[in-house]
Swiss-Prot record:
Keywords: Membrane, Transmembrane, Transmembrane helix. Coiled coil: none annotated. It is a multi-pass membrane protein. It is found in: Membrane. The keyword Hydrolase does not apply. Belongs to the ammonium transporter (TC 2.A.49) family. Rh subfamily. May be part of an oligomeric complex which is likely to have a transport or channel function in the erythrocyte membrane. One of its GO terms (cellular component) is plasma membrane. The chain crosses the membrane at residues 12-32, 44-64, 77-97, 125-145, 172-192, 203-223, 238-258, 265-285, 287-307, 331-351, 358-378. The keyword Transmembrane applies. It comes from Pan troglodytes. This is RH-like protein IA. GO terms for biological process: ammonium homeostasis; ammonium transmembrane transport. One of its GO terms (molecular function) is ammonium channel activity.
Length: 417
């Protein structure tokens, strides 16, 4: 029988992280430079504000959204910040290298930083399926692989299907969800007897998670409009996302009460259902020209989110063996799929309205993009999961899953692990 004491990462974590950071510094020294163009000052400030909104979403929003576990809230917040910082650095280099042929100096602009931040957001979505079961060394590996896979997907889809930045960004929902679920499927599945309570949501951490959801709710319009170039499309994206998430809040509270036998509201449902409209409307937010359609999408997305949170976790536990109380992945995968379908419907309507006869071709292109992104997400996720199972990473023992004491010093404890 193996020991239940956690495996120390004192040697491998500093060595791995600092060596990687030194390598990134060298790459930035030799292969990057700042944008020397004289950009309009007003446009510069506006561009920075969008990037600032994305950073707040990533660091505070997603960081606290995953902090609802009873004994794993410290690690959830701090590890998310660690992955964000590492992911942005690698994404800037990767996007620059993949977008240039022949290779040259990577020019760093505010737009490239926004693009890199969205790549790191993918990791923060997918890692929710494995937080509590892996250590920081394994998360470093996961960040590098997922950011690389997502960057490859963007490059391939952009070159083959001639897709713009916004449409590439909107594949992030489904890509991140299926990548994370694939990784989780490869990890040890059932929790050991006597440790199930660690996977439960506590009152105070759940309130912190709701704080993260509020930050995401406020800044989701900035996320959906971050990579759009046209001012009219950006305006439509902001308006439609705002109305969609507003309706999602009303639907989340009402639907949560309806789903409970005594009519009580579940905070765990609220964490994700309030964001449902923003996910569902994201792909087509720039095409919708009337608020009522965005509001309908917010209503439908909120109901799907509540239904998925109530019924899908048990189904996935039995069929896939993925034991996790969080419902974020079911929301992002289902609502990302809904958003893709709505986009295709609106695209067909727009094509018919303008008298263009290439309807079937346009639909096939969109289905091809979605299928390619999903396939690469599943494949790279499975490979990452198998890689994380290697013993060299010193993964925590299953008895120490969802336990902050494995990674953090608690001053009030007389004996540390």
């Amino acid at each position: 029988m193996s020991s239940k004491y956690p495996r120390s990462v004192r040697r491998c974590l500093p060595l791995c992280a600092l060596t990687l950071e030194a390598a990134l510094i060298l790459l930035f020294y030799f292969f990057t430079q700042y944008d020397a163009s004289l950009e309009d000052q007003k446009g510069l400030v506006a561009s920075y504000q969008v990037g600032q909104d994305l950073t707040v979403m990533a660091a505070i929003g997603f960081g606290f959204l995953t902090s609802s576990f009873r004994r794993h809230s410290w690690s959830s917040v701090a590890f998310s910040l660690f992955m964000l910082a590492l992911g942005v650095q690698w994404a800037i280099l990767l996007d620059g290298f993949l977008s240039q042929f022949p290779p040259g100096k990577v020019v760093i602009t505010l737009f490239s930083i926004r693009l890199a931040t969205t790549s790191a957001l993918s990791v923060l979505i997918s890692v929710d399926a494995v937080l509590g079961k892996v250590n920081l060394v394994q998360l470093v590996v996961m960040v590098l692989v997922e950011v690389t896979a997502l960057g490859t997907v963007r490059m391939v889809i952009s070159n083959i299907f001639n897709t713009d930045y916004h449409m590439n960004l909107m594949h992030i929902y489904v890509f991140a969800a299926y990548f994370g679920l694939s990784v989780a499927w490869c990890l040890p599945k059932p929790l050991p007897k006597g440790t199930e309570d660690k996977d439960q949501i506590a009152t105070i951490p759940s309130l912190s998670a709701m704080l993260g959801a509020l930050f995401l709710w406020m800044f989701w319009p900035s996320f959906n409009s971050a990579l759009l170039r046209s001012p009219i499309e950006r305006k439509n994206a902001v308006f439609n996302t705002y109305y969609a998430v507003a309706v999602s809040v009303v639907t989340a509270i009402s639907g949560s009460s309806l789903a409970h036998p005594q009519g009580k509201i579940s905070m765990s449902y609220m964490h994700n259902a309030v964001l449902a409209g923003g996910v569902a409307v994201g792909t087509s937010c720039h095409l919708i020209t009337s608020p009522w359609l965005a509001m309908v999408l917010g209503l439908v997305a909120g109901l799907i989110s509540i239904g998925g949170a109530k019924y899908l976790p048990g189904c996935c536990n039995r069929v896939l063996g993925i034991y996790h109380s969080s419902v974020m992945h079911y929301n992002f995968s289902l609502l990302g799929l809904l958003g893709e379908i709505i986009y295709i419907v609106l695209l067909v309507h727009h094509t018919v309205w303008n008298g263009n006869g290439m309807i079937g071709f346009q639909v096939l292109l969109r289905i091809g993009e979605f299928s390619l992104a999903t396939t690469i997400a599943l494949t790279s996720g499975l490979l990452t999961g198998l890689l994380l199972n290697l013993k060299i990473w010193k993964a925590p023992h299953a008895a120490k899953y969802f336990d902050d004491q494995v990674f953090w010093k608690f001053p009030h404890l007389a004996v540390e692990f």
